[in-house]
Amino acid sequence: MAEQHTGVGRQRGARPWPRPRRVATLSVHTSPLHQPGTGDAGGMNVYILEVARRLAEADVEVEIFTRATSADVPPVVEMMPGVHVRNIISGPLGGLTKEELPGQLCAFTAGVLRAEASRAAGHYDLIHSHYWLSGQVGWLAKERWGVPLVHTAHTLAKVKNAQLAAGDRPEPKARVIGEEQVVAEADRLVANTKTEAGDLIDRYDADPTRVEVVEPGVDLARFTPAAGDRSRAQALARRRLGLPERGYVVAFVGRVQPLKAPDVLIRAAAALRQRDPALAEELTVVVCGGPSGSGLDRPTHLIELAASLGVTDSVRFLPPQTGDDLPALYRAADLVAVPSYNESFGLVALEAQACGTPVVAAAVGGLVTAVRDQVSGVLVDGHDPAVWARTLSRLLPDTGLRATLAQGARRHACNFSWDRTVSGLLEVYGEAVAAYGPQSSELATCSC
């Protein structure tokens, strides 16, 4: 079952809280306008957009501040009524990696402060920053505007550095220090899972009374099992995506980076050829996504890896999928693999399960919450390709087991929804506003 929206060690929801009228959402390094699976766009983009949409439906206006990366995008974009994206010019429009952005935080902060200064006093009731770069901006803005700061880390440097993939670079000390500062200054810290809450408290010395667990959700109307006969629907989905209609398909969906470990799945396919050549002959591995920081570039190193392992004919590479094609990919797959070295939650796992597709995931971080082991999928200890190959060889031929897991996958995913996430966030927002100062008396109250 999904965790409740609870503060660490406390029960909540027993009293009405003031509801903010307007929220300033900070997302320095990635925009909800960007396609997930490309560059630095991923689950955080989905989170920000889905939360903003539902906050607006609850009559809370949201203005999302992000760094401008294209001259073709206007300074302000209305994504929907009540949700605007403000593109702040801070440094060159292109060519900057996420690691280079700290040098542009001053320019970004200036743009945020100028935008607020053009409004009537007290325009924003609360700031919600996402990722440590945004937290640094939110820290200053909260002091200038006199409003509370709610922060969601999404990933934590100390956790990533403790679980580095081979060839991955450690997060720099400057990021660790920056995260420590934001943790100390934020009025509320939103963790995706109890595991992340524990990391904030144990690794960053966060005040437990300011740490709140609010799980992400999934769009249960968009990500659904195929209607009618599953085998026929799966074949149609594969035809739509140009995948083999016969045999087994195991899909990886996400940014192509060492942390996400798509190479583990390719190496597992090679190991399966040694373990069960007949089964391996029927397997197609799909890697869907683009390299971090480079948009839609082809993942050359994975193409070369597949060639060196002799599995080129078993691996298909797809660009990030949009619209109905992403649910179609999940439905086309027999299994979705999430072999990441760390995930604060793992929205891909939740989306796949909502489509009724079992997930094989590494037993790390938030994936332990996102996937219910032996019920909605299988959690694998470690990243040894031989172990992953053994897991695939057990699951793929066993149609009865996969059918049972498919039913459990949808049931498990139904415990999560974005409406539930926003209900929890509104409670956190209300607590933060109520604790911050007398201006909360001017706001509407809600029983979340």
Curated annotation (Swiss-Prot):
Keywords on record: Glycosyltransferase, Magnesium, Metal-binding, Transferase
Gene: mshA
Positions bound to 1D-myo-inositol 3-phosphate: H29, D40, A41, G42, G43, M44, N45, K98, Y131, T155, R175
Domain of life per record: Bacteria
Function, as annotated: Catalyzes the transfer of a N-acetyl-glucosamine moiety to 1D-myo-inositol 3-phosphate to produce 1D-myo-inositol 2-acetamido-2-deoxy-glucopyranoside 3-phosphate in the mycothiol biosynthesis pathway.
Residues the entry annotates as binding Mg(2+): Y330, R331, A333, T357
Sequence positions that bind UDP-N-acetyl-alpha-D-glucosamine: Q35, P36, G43, R255, K260, Q321, E343, E351
SUPFAM superfamilies noted in UniProt: UDP-Glycosyltransferase/glycogen phosphorylase (SSF53756)
Renumbered residue ranges of the record's region Disordered: 1-21
Reaction(s) catalysed by this chain's protein: 1D-myo-inositol 3-phosphate + UDP-N-acetyl-alpha-D-glucosamine = 1D-myo-inositol 2-acetamido-2-deoxy-alpha-D-glucopyranoside 3-phosphate + UDP + H(+)
Organism: Salinispora arenicola (strain CNS-205)
Name of the molecule in the record: D-inositol 3-phosphate glycosyltransferase
Pfam families on file: Glyco_trans_4_4, Glycos_transf_1
